[in-house]
């Protein structure tokens, strides 16, 4: 992975944008898939139901609990349950939560992720707990107001009691372990003019400018030459190419292509990790996979060489 250049262009609490250069599309797509499905996180995996008099069936609530994002900054401190030395579930592989809410009021009570309590209280900010969610409305003092993720609403007299077990996993096992909800990349358009395009008259050039739905082209007011004003707006519809071919009978005036070694990534996390941490783990996983592939290729090559000498 030597020579690859990464430029971080935008960083927010849950989002980041970066440019990846000096690599091909196979590597870029591998990184995209790894960010989606191969970063270790923690999520609720098992749910034990002790009481549920709400209007929703047990499995509906259990499914919602599994999809609540849990802070996974310390995921490395935990083992996979199948790799743990314990006989069952210990603090090294399982985090226990309780959800026990009763509604004794006459109003409808909303149960949220704030009601999901870990059995052992942790003051550490990075402890495994539901991520913090804030309302767009601030309190009377102008401070952010934590509201939690809605789970269910209880009417008067209804109550629920669930025991939840959170474990380590990756998105390949189930999407609830995905650290990101968006991981996409786009390429940089490359628009090439033939020299003959400047021989078009001014009306033809204006028609070509108007043919583009995203207004990629423009006419220089001083020289009356056709120019590419914003190539990043190109969406590869090739309306300009069709215009040249059908109206001007010159199909080769414009060529639409893209750069093969530059990619623009957009990544949005679920909140379980900071975007930069997701990227760091993504590149680390990609390097491990490439190293493993190289070792296997070398091993197979050596075996074939020994077989040939026999």
From Swiss-Prot:
Main localization is nucleus
| NCBIfam families according to UniProt | PRK00783.1 (NF001988)
Give a yes or no for keyword rRNA-binding in this entry. no
Q: Which CDD domains does the protein's record reference? A: RNAP_II_RPB3
GO BP annotations listed? transcription by RNA polymerase II
Matching entries from Gene3D superfamilies are given as: DNA-directed RNA polymerase, insert domain (2.170.120.12), RNA polymerase, RBP11-like subunit (3.30.1360.10)
Task: State the disulfide connectivity.
Answer: none
What the protein does comes down to: May be a stage-specific RNA polymerase subunit.
Gene Ontology cellular component? RNA polymerase II, core complex
The domain of life is Eukaryota
Report the gene name. Answer: CNJC
Name by which UniProt lists this protein = Conjugation stage-specific protein
Keyword Nuclease applies: no
Family classification: Belongs to the archaeal Rpo3/eukaryotic RPB3 RNA polymerase subunit family.
Q: Which GO molecular-function terms appear in the entry?
A: DNA binding; DNA-directed RNA polymerase activity; protein dimerization activity
Q: Where in the cell is it found?
A: Nucleus
Q: Which organism is it from?
A: Tetrahymena thermophila
Q: What is the lineage of its organism?
A: Eukaryota, Sar, Alveolata, Ciliophora, Intramacronucleata
Kindly give the PANTHER family that the UniProt entry links to this protein. DNA-DIRECTED RNA POLYMERASE, DNA-DIRECTED RNA POLYMERASE II SUBUNIT RPB3
List UniProt keywords, sorted A-Z. DNA-directed RNA polymerase, Nucleotidyltransferase, Nucleus, Transcription, Transferase
InterPro entries attached to this UniProt entry: DNA-dir_RNA_pol_30-40kDasu_CS (IPR001514), DNA-dir_RNA_pol_insert (IPR011262), DNA-dir_RNA_pol_RpoA/D/Rpb3 (IPR011263), RBP11-like (IPR036603), RNAP_Rpo3/Rpb3/RPAC1 (IPR022842), RNApol_insert_sf (IPR036643), Rpo3/RPB3_RNA_Pol_subunit (IPR050518)
